[in-house]
């Protein structure tokens, strides 16, 4: 508690302050493609951003929920290291956090042949796979696992001939080119089996079946 006393001996009501000597934790930096840098930190803390050489990128203040976001005047180049520290309102600065800009878009997803019941394929590991039809109408979204495999089951099987387009969006927000396939929900014709003496069975069927 602090009071003020004038020369005549009059004392003011006390003012109270609580000492804060604890540094905030390191900020969390979300994956970034260099266009926007965001994350979380102690609410009200000033987040200072520099590159690996200590050159300033910018400063921003975390809101009451601890969220912060900063947009550089020019997008940061792929591979730029971003270093962030948080300084609380009393001047305590916490440890550093760092991330590396990923500004490279993932490749187009591979879509396996589908009969419309399930759509599956491969994409960059961890990427969000966004599926639309040939007119751009949404079909659904899913995320590729650590091996790059993904699968999506529509609530209603897609009709024969439906065009399925897929793009992959990585955690940094980069969206790659489109992959595409067409639903084949028509069963093949009955195979033709040639006469056989039992030593060899052969015949004809739908190509690729």
Label every model-predicted segment.
Residues 1-209:
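Ser/Thr-rich low-complexity repeats and stalk/linker segments
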């Amino acid at each position: 508690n602090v009071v003020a006393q004038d020369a005549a001996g009059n004392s003011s009501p006390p003012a109270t302050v609580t000492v804060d000597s604890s540094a905030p934790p390191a900020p969390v930096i979300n994956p970034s493609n260099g266009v926007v840098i965001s994350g979380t930190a102690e609410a009200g803390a000033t987040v200072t951003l520099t590159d690996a050489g200590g050159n300033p990128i910018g400063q921003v203040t975390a809101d009451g929920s601890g969220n912060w976001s900063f947009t550089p005047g020019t997008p940061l180049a792929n591979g730029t290291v971003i270093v962030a520290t948080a300084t609380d309102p009393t001047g305590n600065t916490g440890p550093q956090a760092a991330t590396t800009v990923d500004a490279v878009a993932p490749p187009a997803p591979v879509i396996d042949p589908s009969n419309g019941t399930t759509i599956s394929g491969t994409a960059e590991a961890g990427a969000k796979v966004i599926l639309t039809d040939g007119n751009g109408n949404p079909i659904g979204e899913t995320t590729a696992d650590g091996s790059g495999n993904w699968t999506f089951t529509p609530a209603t099987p897609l009709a024969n001939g439906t065009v399925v387009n897929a793009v992959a969006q990585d955690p940094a927000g980069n969206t790659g080119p489109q992959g595409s396939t067409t639903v084949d929900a028509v069963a093949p014709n009955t195979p033709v089996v040639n006469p056989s003496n039992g030593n060899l069975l052969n015949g004809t069927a739908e190509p690729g079946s």
